[in-house]
Amino acid sequence: MNEILKKRLKLLKNNFGTHINKIANKKILITGANGYIGSILTLILHGNAKLYCLVRNKDKMIDRFQEICGDIDKIDIYEDLYKIQDKIDIVIHCAAPTQSDFFIENPIDTVDIIYTNTKNILDFSKKNNVEKIIFLSTMEIYGDVIGDNIVEDDIGKFSVTNIRNSYPLAKQISEFMVHSYSKKYSLSTAIVRLTQAIGPTAQINDNRVYMDFIRSAIKKSQITLFTKGETKREYIDVFDVATAIIFVMCEKKMFEIYNISNPNIFISIYDLAKTISAKLNVQVVFDLQRDTSQYLPSFSRRLNSKKIYQLGWTPLFDLNQSLDDMIKYIKEVNE
C-alpha cells in the first residue's frame, strides 16, 4: 500500500477507531466502489466489515483497488445488484456520474442513471430489510441559494432550460425518493450533501477543477484559468468525507440530512489555483475567450455543517495537507 495512505489509515483509526469498530462484521454494500469516495470507503472498511462492491466494470475495480490497497481479499465485487444473495446490513449509495461534460452532453442519461439506480437501490433495500441506507448527494441541490450559513432546510430554484442542471435536479428527485421510501416503508435512511472533495487517490484523468490545475501544472508547466475564478466554496478531504459517512452509519435515526464540509477550507477557484501553482512552482495565466457554458455561474456558498459536528465528527486534514498528499500521490502512481 502507498505510504501516504498507510499514514492516513493509521491516523483515522487512532482518532475514529471506536466508530469504525461499531460497524465491524457488518455486511456493507458500497455502490460506485471504484469511484473517488467509494474507493476510500472500501479502503477504510476493508478488513473491518464484510464488503460488497457494486461497480459497472469488475476489472476496473480490481485494478483501482490493487493500486490503492494491493489486497482485494474479503471483498465481493458485483456488476449486477440482483446477484447479491447475502443479507446486507448497510448500503452506501455512492454511484453516479460526476463529470460536468457528461451532464451537458447527456442530460437525459444523467437524470435516468441517477434516478433509476437510486430507485433500484431503495427497492433492493426494502426487499432485504436493510438496516441503514446512506445516499450521497451534493451541495449543488441548493440551486441559487448562496451565503455563509446554508442549512439542510434551505431550498433553491433551478432553470429547467439549463442543461447543466440535469445533475442537481436528478440528485434532488433522488433525495425525495430516499425520504419517501423512509416514510412509507420505515427504512432508516440518511442523505449526506457533500461539498467538493479533495485529497489523494483522485485519478489523473478526473475533470474536477483542482485536478485540471494539477494536471496542467505537471504537464504544461502552467495553470490556465478560463474564468476569473471568483466562485468561492468549501472543500473537504476525501478521507474526512469517508469518516463523516461512517459517523452517519452509526446513527440510529430513521431519517436525517447532513451537510458535509470543512469550514476551515473556504477558498475561491483563483486562490486555489494560486495555492497549487506555488506548490508546483508554476504560473497562473488566464484565457477568458473560451466558451464557459459548461461551468456553473460564479457563486459564494458556505454550508452549515453543525449537524455532523454534533455527532462528534471533526475533519483531520487541512488544505495544505490535502493538496500535498494529492500531488505526491499523483506523481508516485503515474511515474
Swiss-Prot record:
CDP binds at residues 100, 164, 212, 224, 226-227, 233, 296. It comes from the Bacteria. NADP(+) binds at residues 34, 36-37, 56, 60, 94, 96, 98, 167, 171, 197. Keywords: Capsule biogenesis/degradation, NADP, Nucleotide-binding, Oxidoreductase. The keyword Nucleotide-binding applies. CDP-6-D-glucitol binds at residues 100, 140, 164, 195-196, 208-209, 212, 224, 226-227, 233, 296. It is an enzyme of class 1 (oxidoreductase). Its EC number is 1.1.1.-. Disulfide bonds: none annotated. Signal peptide: none annotated. GO terms for molecular function: nucleotide binding; oxidoreductase activity. It catalyses: CDP-6-D-glucitol + NADP(+) = CDP-6-keto-D-fructose + NADPH + H(+). Pathway: Capsule biogenesis; capsule polysaccharide biosynthesis. NADP-dependent oxidoreductase involved in the biosynthesis of capsular polysaccharides. Catalyzes the reduction of CDP-6-D-fructose with NADPH to generate CDP-6-D-glucitol. Homodimer. Belongs to the NAD(P)-dependent epimerase/dehydratase family. This is CDP-6-D-glucitol synthase.
